Amino acid sequence: MRVVLQRVKEASVTIEGQVVGQIGQGYLLLVGFGPDDTEETLDYMVHKITNLRVFESEPGKMNLGLKDVDGAILSVSQFTLYADVKHGNRPGFSNAAKPSLAEPLYQRFNEKLAATGIPVATGQFGADMQVALVNDGPVTIWYEK
């Protein structure tokens, strides 16, 4: 599982001209799954993400977490995080989990995030989405398990 986390002032995801998910301050998560990901992988990622402290408690001190600032999460599935670009000029995606595995993992991941009490908005698995965001910092964290 790979997650790119971006601290944002706001973010939204649009499908066919309709906003389907949006948040104010919080995290935009770009989420990809590999073929060996399990419930244990989800639990690890949820713990790491929901306990991350990257909001300032005072100038220059990142000591507050998402709950401390009443933040939210926008979770967007993105299989292209598993792109293989070692050969040629066109990426390959054979390292990504098949949709039949990735979609239920994505749904469970979002359920587990929401179960922590943090508001969670989502995109739509497999859809062509337009993601808009206002980076805060910028702060970008890469998770992989």
From Swiss-Prot:
Key words, A-Z? Cytoplasm, Hydrolase, RNA-binding, tRNA-binding
Top EC category? hydrolase
Under the heading Pfam families, the entry gives: Tyr_Deacylase
Q: Where is this motif: Gly-cisPro motif, important for rejection of L-amino acids?
A: 137-138
The reactions it catalyses are: glycyl-tRNA(Ala) + H2O = tRNA(Ala) + glycine + H(+); a D-aminoacyl-tRNA + H2O = a tRNA + a D-alpha-amino acid + H(+)
User: Which is one GO molecular function term here?
Assistant: Gly-tRNA(Ala) deacylase activity
User: Which E.C. number(s) belong to this protein?
Assistant: 3.1.1.96
**What's the subunit arrangement here?**
Homodimer.
- Describe the function of this protein: An aminoacyl-tRNA editing enzyme that deacylates mischarged D-aminoacyl-tRNAs. Also deacylates mischarged glycyl-tRNA(Ala), protecting cells against glycine mischarging by AlaRS. Acts via tRNA-based rather than protein-based catalysis; rejects L-amino acids rather than detecting D-amino acids in the active site. By recycling D-aminoacyl-tRNA to D-amino acids and free tRNA molecules, this enzyme counteracts the toxicity associated with the formation of D-aminoacyl-tRNA entities in vivo and helps enforce protein L-homochirality.
Task: Indicate what this protein is called per its UniProt record.
Answer: D-aminoacyl-tRNA deacylase
Q: Which gene encodes it?
A: dtd
